[in-house]
Amino acid sequence: MSGGAALPVSQMELHKVNEVQFEIFKERQIKSYAVCLVEHAKSYANAADQSGEASMICVWVPLTSNSACETCHRKHPECPGHFGYIELAEPVFNIGVFDLVLLVLKCVCKTCGALLLNTREQDVHKKLQHVTGLNRLRQVAKMAEAKCRVSTSTEDDMGIDGFDSAPFNGGSGMGPGATRGCGASQPRVSRFYGIYPTLVIKAVHEEQDAEWHADKVRQVLDRVSDDDARLMGFDPQRCHPRDLVLTVLPVPPPQVRPAISFGGLRSDDELTHQIMSIVKRNNQLRRDKESDVQAAIDRSRALLQEHVATYFNNASTYYKPTKVNDTKKLKSLTERLKGKYGRLRGNLMGKRVDFSARTVITGDPNIDVDEVGVPFSVAMTLTFPERVNTVNKKRLTEFARRTVYPSANYIHHPNGTITKLALLRDRSKVTLNIGDVVERHVINGDVVLFNRQPTLHRMSMMGHRVRVLNYSTFRLNLSCTTPYNADFDGDEMNLHVPQSLLTKAELIEMMMVPKNFVSPNKSAPCMGIVQDSLLGSYRLTDKDTFLDKYFVQSVALWLDLWQLPIPAILKPRPLWTGKQVFSLILPEVNHPATPQDRPPFPHNDSVVMIRRGQLLCGPITKSIVGAAPGSLIHVIFNEHGSDEVARFINGVQRVTTFFLLNFGFSVGVQDTVADSDTLRQMNDVLVKTRRNVEKIGAAANNRTLNRKAGMTLLQSFEADVNSALNKCREEAAKKALSNVRRTNSFKVMIEAGSKGTDLNICQIAVFVGQQNVAGSRIPFGFRRRTLPHFMLDDYGETSRGMANRGYVEGLKPHEFFFHTMAGREGLIDTAVKTSDTGYLQRKLIKALEDVHAAYDGTVRNANDELIQFMYGEDGLDGARIEGGQLFPLPFRDDKEMEDTYKYEYDVDGTFSGKVGGNYMDPHVRKMLRADPQNVRKLQEEYEQLTADREWSRKMLDLEDRDKLKLNLPVNPGRLIQNARSTMGKRSQVSNLSPITIIDHVRKLQEDLMKLFPSYHRGGDGYIRNTLSRERIESALTLFNVHLRQLLASKRVLKEYKLNDRAFEYLLKEIRTKYHQSLTTPGENIGAIAAQSCGEPATQMTLNTFHNAGISSKNVTLGVPRLLELLNVSRNQKHASMTVSLFPPYDEKRNAQKAQHLIEYCTLESITRRIQFIYDPDPRHTVVEADRDILELEWNVMDESDAELRIQEVVAGSPWVVRLELDVDMVTDKALDMKDVKQAILRVDESYIIETGMANNVRQRTIRMRSRYNEGADSIPKLKREIPALLARVHLRGIPGVRRALLKDTTEFTVDQATGKMSGNKIWAIDTDGTALRRAFIGVVGEDGKNIINAVKTSSNKVPEVCSLLGIEAARSKMLTELREAYLAYGLNINYRHYTILVDTICQHGYLMAVSRSGINRSDTSGPLMRCSFEETVKVLMAAASFGECDPVRGVSANLVLGNQARVGTGLFDLVLNMAALQQAVPQAEAVAPGKDVNVYHSLGSTLQQNIQSSIAYRPRDHDATPFVNNASLFLRQGFGGGSSSAPVTASAPYNPSTTYHGGRLEASAVHRSQAYSTSPALEYGGREASASQMYSVMSSASAFNPVSTRMSSVAHSYSEYSEASSYHLQHSVAPTSMQASLPRTDNSMTMQGIGSVSVPYTPHAMSSAAPPSQVYASTEVGRSHSEDSRSQSALYVPTLSPTHAGYAIRGDEPSTHRSDSNVMWREAGGGREQDEEDDLSTNYMPTAKTPQQAAPPTAAEFGDEEEEEQ
């Protein structure tokens, strides 16, 4: 091989790494891999002087660009580097595995190396059965240590030296009865802690200490057999315990420790110097051993060990860090691997990337919501690679030859050479060849990835379309700032340009902004109208906004409309209302969405009502068009799809911006000044509050204030005062807003929702209000006062933080000081919680990153372990869930059930004469009576509904009737309303039969079962596996119950009055939308769950709040509570129980008694003062306060008792212990003084209780004295013993329950007679402190029965629940506690994300902490995943020591190795259909001569149109394949039917199997009113789709169609064509062989077998394409002549619109519905009717919105034969 010859780059695909095997290199392996022995500490800077040492040079000298390796003769970077090795003079410890060496030594005999366990014992195998690796070694060491401890403690039964011979009998690998071991006494080994830290093992034997160095330990480990090593968890083939001690040290190549060159100087790496030091110390030790001086040997050995240890880890506790100079520490191998900037996390898990840009962002309301404004400088620097082919060669050549933007930067040739175009003098002669790759500039319409850090959730990285603009900042639409959490105060964002078509396709299909309008976190929109656009919408739709013709025409141009609606006012001049203008933007939707939400028609224009796309009343506010669940954004997304939402947002922003530019809006000082009437009312509020505070203070001073449960008097006072002051601010805010005039700019912004609240306007104009710190008033901080300016002990409102002035007037100095105190708290919280929540989210991501949805519908991790049978227990996508659906079924009583669901039939099963009444068709009633079985079916329906009611009452968490709302994937109520408004007539009688309704609803439920994936489904669709069938039935149970109660036959007939067409449309919609809601296989739902739980945590505060005014139960909230739960903390700060009570203790009065019985109470807790008094005479006490009661007790005492008492007192101590009890606490606890006396005597009988005062005495005292006279030692002894005694005297309650508080809950009961359900208030006990085990035992009440209902009693301490009740109970409790932690801050996260997190924590049967102690201790995750989280080197060392193997299945492992992760689009493999490939049309034949088709760029525009111009455009269509279909496509320029037309594509040979999309395209001009989309990818369902829209659908689907239509660069996407475009009908000739019966497709049909791509429902006449030689016509019986004339169609010719917005008024032509029985083909020239319809088709202009709206497909179009054919 010639020196320095570079190897050619291989074109072969790299093999994928399937697994990684870890092991520790043995001595012979290190030597075999090395190229030389390193014996001299030389840098070999001058390689020429080291002749004869070539191998040594390649170890020491780093390669330069001109030099070649002396070993392999390759140049940099082809040379991989070569190892050397150092032969150590003595073995040394590897600091990374030193702890493992200690564990092994504890397991084996130090003399013979045998295992210190009897492996024949069953207990040994039982404990080691399920543990491997490090956990196994720890378990063996634990058992061996316990065995040795037992042996030494029972020496009488032992053998030699106190050790049982049993552990050495019959070990592994030995025959039965064979004897193992030497029986030697075993020293105790531990780490040596000397004056100077070192790696030495301390061995203690017979009280003599010895130091074992590595050579001694190596000798012991060398005697360990392979079988014993295997039992300890080692793999002897990978790592024997002897290999843990180093005898040979490998020297890494210079590529690992490159030198730094600067000018002519070179500086070696720190590791190089450390290796040199090791070589020097090693040589010195060898020389010292030859000299045989022990002191020198010890010193050299210690230095060698230290240098080797710090070479591996320079941050350990064994040695002081080695420094390379006075300040800088050595960066060892460990420091280079671990940490955020180490090799794993810094260079493998995350990398720096090319083709990215970063700059400041600014807002721009004139670009689309899915666009990003890119500066020219960025667009000319970033490039996109396009491969040259026959299709795009001409266009790319023009790019390459241009010298100004848009141009190209580089050309990559197939031979590997690169042409830099900027260096060419003459670029006009550049030629391109097929196969070249041109890196062209980023141009308008390119798809890029936009990101803002921190990337907390999926919506922080979204795809945008490029809009190249002037200036130097990224321009962002304001509606996109919410998911990015961005503002324009200097934020910077990152832009990434995809570098492949696959990446671009994934961006378009999954990451574009419209795809992410609805967040899976809250199942609600994360984007909406904000800021100025929201304010403009409110003012535009105000009831007194009227607009003239000039303004409305301007708006029409913005919206690309050419026909105005009829003005609301005609005289004296035409005026349009703002609501009419806003209606031009609205698609055909209804709001409120469901009938039960519909309010009565308001007279004050206060309620928004939208019907069929017309805003009838009400102003548009944030709740209507903002990012809120159930808003207009949400409804449009569910009804019409994401693209329609984008159109709506873009239209609103353009119109409102134009409106504000013309009408203006400003805020001035006059808006902040309150009038005299408002100031007077505010002053009255302040005076009223001040008097109220004074009353509370007076009541507290008089001790008459009602104390709250568990609170002291001072705490109750503070709670009442703080509550009164906060109410004062709220009341003032409401009055301030109501008194402000309607035109006040602040009020307008507040009511619109664009900025501010009523509290803000109150603080600005009136007063700021009470300032709180940590949820309470400003505390005393300066000698019993808040500030030196106030009196001592001033508890008034002014001195404790009340600010009585507003911002306009200005705060007083002390008010300003208090105000800054409250603000500082928020700043500190924000600073502290940022790091905590960021680390919390990282832990969540690591724990859940491998959890994904599998193709069988289950949820699994990387090892295919089952996490859930169904994602979220229902298998649905969180973004498709609709909340807020009322569910009144559980609250219906028997009478309401009968009125709503039951028909009029007798008990004997015969219909009464009233059946059907006025809501059933007479023919249906006659048919119903004809068959006696019909009654039975109706009875079964009612029985099923009654059973559903009972099931829902038992299973659901019931609330009030108006609050019980369901979260389901489909909103049937809205679909029913849509069906009624489009197909039904309110006055008509339904033509449906109840039996038909019941059968169709049951059929629908069976169809829903078939939508779920399962591997056990037979050919008939039935699932034969019981478990698989049950999980699907369980997922559908709640939805089926809701569906049955909504679509009960009587409700459909009587309440909805649906006809057959509307009912079949409704069922089809429900099925389709449910199918769309199923989660996608491969979805990384674990990461979504982690983001959904981690991102809202940033909105939490870190404080532990004291709920003032509610109870004194201290609860941990926010991030600390989350950390407690996720870390599975066993020492919770505020653990508590909820104790349920048996009747009658669940009533309030009895619950108070139970409260005292449960709360733990000792004598210490109720004792206020302890006195020691010398009082030897019991009859004449020296305490004056006790004389009366003592005299009373002596008088009632018998003489014998009195004499006995006197004798005891005389013999006892003269010192009396006087306990003064807290009267209030004794009263609260309901304690009897006799009980206290008995409790004292139960604990200690050495005391005489002289008196316990009677219960009716105001002062409660106890006098007690010792029975023994200790003389002078009495007082010290009493002072020592009495406090301990008081703490031990247990009066009542459960130990551990520090406080018990009453808590009321609602329990629903059912009246069996009427079936009515009512809620009753019952009382339970909330405790501070937990003792669940003791609570389960119970507490006996006054009647001698247990008062605690253990079945309903729970603790918030999850580990305690797990230990007592098992893992399932712990899972349920963990789920409940997580939800409550988020709900405390108003964060309502979708239920399915909690379940993923909780099931992952509990999946192994124990609670796995989401921390390094849980994730890195799990055996299921591989070493690569664990080391990428934390403890990098520790994990890798353990993996190598125990020979672990990583199967490379997880996300982290694949990222480390550069593989595609097996989630998402990487979960499946694609198989190429070679047969279909043979039928593909070649590129050269598919493209017309001289024409260029843009395959790579979504814009599809000419080069000149990419240059900045005044004509805006909106590219939208996706990439398509470079093939065309059999249709000839013509374009006309101009309006209303221009005269010029030119074909832009040639015809391809006709292929019947590939004409589906083309056929839909051809027929779309005629049947666009019938096009009905049911697919999320093709989102025009329910709205008339224009021909240009249908083309957009066509081009989007063309990626799946081998023969698809491709428009020229002039033809833009649907957004560039409005429905005002003209559709020109062209003639063509059809062959006679075409059949009238056309193929069709179902919603679940897949395109070309790729994935599960849903296609829209298409009427039969649109299902196939006519050949180029055919003409298509349609007639229908019963249609009018004018309607039938519109049915004549051929290829359409859309006309370009002059503006860039694609909006139109719907209903521009009547709806036509045709069945396939009325479709026929006619030969060209077969007598086409010539009449006025020709002029209509060529000069068509849309008209205003008319009552004849486009109706959804008819019932006939949803025939059963369609599904049968599918």
Swiss-Prot record:
Keywords: DNA-binding, DNA-directed RNA polymerase, Magnesium, Metal-binding, Nucleotidyltransferase, Nucleus, Transcription, Transferase, Zinc. GO terms for biological process: DNA-templated transcription. Residues 813-825 are annotated as: Bridging helix. Its EC number is 2.7.7.6. InterPro entries: DNA-dir_RpoC_beta_prime, RNA_pol_asu, RNA_pol_N, RNA_pol_Rpb1_1, RNA_pol_Rpb1_3, RNA_pol_Rpb1_3_sf, RNA_pol_Rpb1_4, RNA_pol_Rpb1_5. SUPFAM superfamilies: beta and beta-prime subunits of DNA dependent RNA-polymerase. This is DNA-directed RNA polymerase II subunit RPB1-A. It comes from Trypanosoma brucei brucei. The gene is TRP4.8.
